[in-house]
Amino acid sequence: MGNDMISIVMSTYNEPVEWIQKSINSILGQSYKNIEFIIVCDNPKNNDLIKLLEEYKDNDNRIVTLYNDVNIGLTKSLNKAINKATGKYIARMDSDDISDKFRIEKQLSYLKNNNLDLIGAGVKCITEQEEAITNLNKFPKESKEFNKKILYNNCMPHPTWFGKKEVFESLQGYREVDFAEDYDFLLRACYKGFKLGNINEILLDYRMRESSISNKNGLKQFITSQELVKAYNENYILELNKLLQQIKEKINHLSNDEMNTYLEASKLFAQGVKGLNPIKAVKSICISKYYRKKVMCYIKGIF
């Protein structure tokens, strides 16, 4: 098992240097040593970031750095890293998260022992200051259960992905599906017959950034996820042009009031979870029909 090369792919843009250092160090310090760490710099104007990455590369030959000439976004950057990967397996990492020391070792063992093709893991949600918020690890473990739960919500945290390279090659990487490229990938993987699951151990600290909580595109992301499920159920999930047209039509019909109400509900829910305030959490699902539907999908995806 220790001879299998594992490629870990990560994209960086404008994250604080301290976060990036902790992220990189958590990968370089893995108990499993036979890795290549492919880091894409998607901000060619960030000289401090470039200097930092080159220093790491000079000190550890397992690091491979790729520099984009212009900002091309997460999807294309990850595909660029995947195409560069030489490992039998590919793992994901985000530049603001922190992996458990035994993450790669445990995921490789779990994937092999359970005859799976792509897996995720549980996460500990932390604030920007690394204060613990909550643990999320009630994700479907077996492929049969996963195929049912994935139709309600994304049940594999993106930065915890670990899978066979052939999965990424078969799907030709990520597609340009705004706000939901990871959910699109998982649905296509299930549709094509790959076996997905999760190891229900906390193997990553997931940093919940304030900018993501107050994301103005939250409702667009939810509508996109709903359209992806519809495309899966109606057998056109692989037809990208048709899918994107359906998403565009749905989003164009949203009003500013609906988007603002959804955003407010999202903030209330986050405040309720952080402060263990059930009143705020309940209020969040009352003020927006879309957020109410999202919460119901989440509950169905767990139980």
PLM region descriptions:
Residues S23, N68-A85, K106:
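Glycine-rich, basic loop-to-helix element that forms the pyrophosphate-binding segment
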Residues F102-T134:
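Conserved donor NDP-sugar-binding/catalytic core segment of glycosyltransferases
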Residues E15-G29:
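Short, well-formed alpha-helical segments that are part of the catalytic scaffolds
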Residues S11, P140-L228:
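Conserved nucleotide-sugar donor-binding catalytic segment
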Residues N3-S7, L28-I39, D60-V64:
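Short loop->beta transition adjacent to catalytic acidic/histidine clusters or analogous donor-positioning motifs
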Residues C41-K51, V70, D94:
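A conserved acidic beta->alpha catalytic loop
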